[in-house]
Amino acid sequence: MNIKIGVVCGSFHRSEVERMLEWSTDEADRQGIEIEDVIWVPGAMEVPLALDRLLSRDDIEGAACLGIIEKGQTQHGLAMGHAVIKSIIELQIVHEKPIGLGIIGPGAAPEHIGPRLEPHARAAVGAVVAMSE
């Protein structure tokens, strides 16, 4: 498969997301697709705009987004997570290009993050591949 994708990474949990990016890159290599561009954004709220810009490009055929939305002391993360995921779904439909969701949470407790890094990263790329066939 000869497709080019972009990856949007949330930098709030940079060290964890850098590891996710490594696994996503490995999965892209395994699947025979190319990561054409990586965009780092401050957090989850900026992911939809970065995805929109990526998917507007003719050379990008899909995208993956990687990040973490932790459980906080208020409902802020949950509300934000729902809004971001809704926007991501809408962007897939508008651009007719697949987006793989590799955002852990919302509501992830610290002990849940580590075990989910690799599976979420690989699954995000896998979803783009599956929907590109």
What are these regions (language model features)?
Residues 2-40:
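Glycine-rich phosphate/diphosphate-binding loop of Rossmann-like nucleotide-binding domains
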Residues 11-12, 68-69, 104-107:
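Short, ordered loop/turn segments at secondary-structure junctions
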Residues 37-45, 105:
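Short beta->alpha junction loops
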Residues 50-87:
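Glycine-rich phosphate-binding loop
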Residues 80-105, 123:
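Short, acidic/small-residue loops that bind anionic groups at enzyme active sites
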Residues 99, 106-121:
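Phosphate-binding/catalytic loops
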Residues 118-133:
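A charged, well-structured terminal subsegment
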